[in-house]
């Protein structure tokens, strides 16, 4: 009887370990996917600042955003796209974008929250470059079999006071 109990306990432990490892692999695949989507958006913007459709292909129609440029929440992919199109016509452009300290939290396999520090570089029409720093959060939801960006919050990350 003791041997049977020992086998059952060992079996349960092995199953729990296997399930946990499988969940961790799925979470890592999700993390890799949402980070890659974010970097692809940046690459599309760098390649062509007017390619708003390409930049927002993974954005949900009900997308919302907070950022330091506007005092209110921006509601909807359509509104965000119109503002991005106007920004794409500006004389300056993004020439570099990097993600530092990324962290992805996955919930129930269909919600992913990506937080990171953004380090970028813009260039104006005269060739002058300006570094850009931000603290960022993006929320993704799996709709069907596709991850979609549903919310983002972008905040400035000022240099520390000396």
Q: Which role does the model predict for each range below?
A:
Residues 61-62, 116-123:
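Generic short beta-strand segments
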Residues 70-72, 120-122, 154-158:
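Solvent-exposed loop/turn segments at secondary-structure junctions
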């Amino acid at each position: 009887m003791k041997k049977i109990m020992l086998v059952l306990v060992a079996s349960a432990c092995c199953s729990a370990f296997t399930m946990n490892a499988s969940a961790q692999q799925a979470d890592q695949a999700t993390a890799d996917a949402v980070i890659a989507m974010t970097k692809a958006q940046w690459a599309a913007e760098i390649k062509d600042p007017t390619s708003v459709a390409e930049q927002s292909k993974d954005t949900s129609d009900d997308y919302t955003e907070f950022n330091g440029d506007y005092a209110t929440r921006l509601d909807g992919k359509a509104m965000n796209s119109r503002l991005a199109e106007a920004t794409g016509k500006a004389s300056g452009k993004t020439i570099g974008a990097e993600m530092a300290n990324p962290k992805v939290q996955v919930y129930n396999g269909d919600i992913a929250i990506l937080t990171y520090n953004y380090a970028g570089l813009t260039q104006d029409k005269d060739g002058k470059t300006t570094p850009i720093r931000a603290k960022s959060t993006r929320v993704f939801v799996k709709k069907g079999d596709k991850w979609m960006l549903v919310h983002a919050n972008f905040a400035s990350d000022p240099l520390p006071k000396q």
